[in-house]
Amino acid sequence: PAIDLRLHTSVERVDLHLGTVDAAIRYRETPEPDLYCTLLYEDRFIVVASPTLGLSRPEDLQRVTLFHVANRRVPADSPSWENWRRRYGPPTLNIDAGLTFSDETHALQAAVAGQGVVIASELLARDLLQRGVLSAPFSNALPGARYYLVTTEAVAQRADIIALREWLLSQMASGDGGHPTAG
C-alpha cells in the first residue's frame, strides 16, 4: 500500500495499548481477546529436502542427515523429529543423529545444498519450494501456530491500517500452498 512503514523485528512482545506501535504480526495459537486480530496464515511444518536426494518414502529419511532446529519459538507442539517419528515414522528413525542449527533459515540453506533434510515452516520454505530448489517429498505435516495482524480496536479502523491489512491478506493468499483466512 502507499503508506510508510517502520518495521521492527523482535521476539519481544510490544504493548499496543501504549500507542507507540500501531500494529504487529504475532505468531500464536489463538487470537488475543483484548486486541483486534486478523488471521493472516495458518502455518504447518513440512519435511523439505533437495530434490537431488530422491526422497519418496518415510523410510528414505534413514539414509540422509536430519537437521534439527534449536530454540524455535513455536507455541504449538514442537516440530521436531521426535514428533514426526511418533506420527509418521519410520519407527526406526534415529532422531538423535544429525546436525543442529540455531536458525531455521540456515538449515534451509543446507537443505538446498543437498546436505540433509529439515522440518521447516511451510511459509518460510514456500519460495524455495516454488523455485524448485527444495521439494516436500511427503504430504504429511506437523501443526504450527497462526500469524495474526493485531491492533487495538481504535487503530483497526484507520484507513492506513485497513490498507495494510488488505495488502497483507492478498500477499499471503498469492502464494501456492498457503492457508490464509480473514478473521
Kindly give the residue locations of the regions a language model identified.
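C-terminal regulatory
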Residues: 18, 30-115, 120, 124-144, ...
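A late-sequence structural motif
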Residues: 139-179
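Central regulatory/effector-binding core of bacterial HTH transcription factors
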Residues: 1-33, 181-183
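A generic membrane alpha-helix/interface feature
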Residues: 24, 40, 132, 150-151
